Amino acid sequence: MFVKLLPPEVRKVIAAGEVIESPVDVVKELVENSLDAKATKVEVEIVKGGKRLIRVKDNGTGIHPEDVEKVVLQGATSKIETEKDLMNISTYGFRGEALYSISSVSKFKLRSRFFQEKEGKEIEVEAGNILGTRRVGMPVGTEVEVRDLFFNLPVRRKFLKKEDTERRKVLELIKEYALTNPEVEFTLFSEGRETLKLKKSSLKERVEEVFQTKTEELYAEREGITLRAFVSRNQRQGKYYVFINKRPIQNKNLKEFLRKVFGYKTLVVLYAELPPFMVDFNVHPKKKEVNILKERKFLELVRELAGKEKPIVDIPLSQPVKTYKPTYEILGQMDETFILVKDSEYLYFVDQHLLEERINYEKLKDENLACRISVKAGQKLSEEKIRELIKTWRNLENPHVCPHGRPIYYKIPLREIYEKVGRNY
């Protein structure tokens, strides 16, 4: 038998099948696009579990009208340009396959208004064939409508699960992305009814709202790896969620490891931040699998985190004020943005805005107001103000991250500094 190149239309369907297997895959790709577009509101609507209709609307930055026709082409992406870029991915999407794959196996319509334009542009595609484009009036953002998924692949359509099963999978997916994007409001409609509404909140509030339980917050960092976990013990059934650089990870081995170190009847929501070069998401077309460069050190830090019943604190940040004794030295302000603090082991670079934002949030419980009234980067502080901020920092309930989840400080071991210049510490 002679080897032949497959016709383009056949290759198109095969490629689409690697990325899109069910309605939840469509929702995943579209929600990721919305988040990459900096949306603060994402609305998802499904009918018949997504088999009949999937619609995703957002208020993100939108797509430039010149790019609307490009986004449904294979390999069309604004995220990467070279192979090296694959090692520094900071967005959800990067392959340039999602909209191409979805539009190849559905009746597809996309309308988007770029934030610098006065009107939007709509494109309609059926089974990969562009039917036409037109100008439309709409707010800034993007709306994608996917009808009759796999209408041109009847065999694939037969393998879809029952509507209730597909609906539950979509609901679970929305919760996962809501868990790692608390600053975004998520709404899910099914059969015309609102089934989920999550308004923007702090990360801890979002976790507790999704799971309807109080949690204990844990924190650890080492060698560029930052871990933050929310744990609730004595659950009827253990649940384990892992997010690496804000991306949900489906890894059975890692979840089994969490079961062993945290316990089998524990809710664990683990957030890991790693430098992009340490993580390879380009393992599987669905980006669900991941390779970690320093996996052993990562797991060691997770084990250490699990052994803590209270948040890990590297310096005594939670001493009662009346027994307060300085164990640190304030070195001054750097670039009118960071406060430099040194203790017996570390040099800390403390972000002055994020620190006061956390202080104000713990007083007011309003993250937006806390942000607005806090000192800004680029603002020169008096010595008295610096002392006040650092003293309060040491007594915060959560001294590690701001209400939006950004780290308040970065620390360098003093031993490492001395070793770099060839001195003993």
UniProtKB/Swiss-Prot annotation:
Q: Which domain of life is it from?
A: Bacteria
Q: Pfam families from the entry?
A: DNA_mis_repair (PF01119), HATPase_c_3 (PF13589), MutL_C (PF08676)
Would the keyword ATP-binding turn up in this protein's UniProt record? no
Q: Which GO terms describe its molecular function?
A: ATP binding; ATP hydrolysis activity; ATP-dependent DNA damage sensor activity; mismatched DNA binding
Q: Which GO terms describe its cellular component?
A: mismatch repair complex
Assigned keywords, A-Z? DNA damage, DNA repair
Q: Which Gene3D superfamilies match?
A: 3.30.230.10, Histidine kinase-like ATPase, C-terminal domain (3.30.565.10), MutL, C-terminal domain, dimerisation subdomain (3.30.1540.20)
CDD domains reported for this sequence: HATPase_MutL-MLH-PMS-like, MutL_Trans
Q: DNA repair: is it a keyword of this entry?
A: yes
Protein name per its UniProtKB record: DNA mismatch repair protein MutL
Q: Which organism is it from?
A: Aquifex aeolicus (strain VF5)
Q: What is the lineage of its organism?
A: Bacteria, Pseudomonadati, Aquificota, Aquificia, Aquificales
